[in-house]
Amino acid sequence: MSETSCVNATVAVVGNPTSNKGKGAEVGKQVVELLQEAGRKHGFNVIDVTGESFDDSLANARNRRNEYDYLVAVGGDGMIALGANAVGCSGKPLGIVATGSGNDFARGLELPVNRVETAVDGIVGAIVRGTHIDVDMGLATSLQGGYAVDSSTGDDLVGDSDVPLRPAVNRFYAGMLSCGLDASINDRANHSRLPNGSVRYFVAAIVELTHMKRYGYHIKATLADGTVEERDIISPLLTVANSRHIGGGIEISPYSRFSDGLLDLVWLDHVPNVAECVDAVSHAYSGKILGCKVFGWKRVRDIEITRAQEGDEPPVLMADGEYVGRLPVKVVVQDRALRVLVPPAVAESQAANTEEKVLEAIKRDHRDPVTGKTDTCYAKRSR
């Protein structure tokens, strides 16, 4: 695509002005200025659709979608989720300036993390050259009895007369839907009065890990081969993953690919003992965590998650680090529904991450690619 293709195009910038004690607003302003400078050179216009809050910014990005051709989200995974919910399924490309604490989605795409000028340069280059990739998303919607919560606090929503509201969940996510331990850690950290974000998360993780609960889930999933599996899962951890990373780089779902038309269901088979915890931690950043037998794994096209009769009450659901709602919920993969601006090198790297390479990793970890089970007999057959 020639450089003249972006002449008279409009690039919208959206950020979260309340993030990081107001520093998010400063970074957003910097991104706008950098894009305006590039726009004068390449002939595109820049508008800022940032609102006064996360929800206000999302509403602006949605309601003003006919005013722009590209949307640039500035912030962490939550802001990328905002961008996905603003332009998902529209064909309008999303640019990512990753400046959060986790940045797991950007990390999975090998985009710059906490390097604002480099990220903007990459976005401008992608706009000028027309380079992008189309990635999958998950769509979470409420089943009967499920409902959305306040996206900032996780609290139940109330009306003007303090009457509880029960709006349905209807939300795209780009990275992970967290239904267990990872959600409870985030929730505890968000409600902590400790001053430092890293300290809040560390303390919350220690508390939750040392008081691990056995949450009760009932799942009904359409697997990759089209068969339907229905069962209870009593587990501290249950995650429906579109991307590989969580928690600032932990590869909890190393077999995930952004454009395979599938989601990966990952859970703990049981409350792990000390040795199993050490084994999992030692493989957390190497892409080999699912080689640990304490984990369960399956590829799914869609999944219904409800409350099992046994087990503890699951925590509030979180997607990409933001509050979503309460069970029950249905999740369906949205095949290549989000267009993302990327440099040519990233597009080539993602294209090189083939299904064959993923199957090699699955076999390396002694798992059956169809059933997801760790099987000694299968391991011997695959050698």
PLM region descriptions:
Residues 18-19, 101, 181, 244-245, ...:
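Short, glycine/serine-rich, charged loops/turns that create anion-binding
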Residues 12, 36-40, 45, 49-51, ...:
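Catalytic core of DAGKc-family lipid kinases
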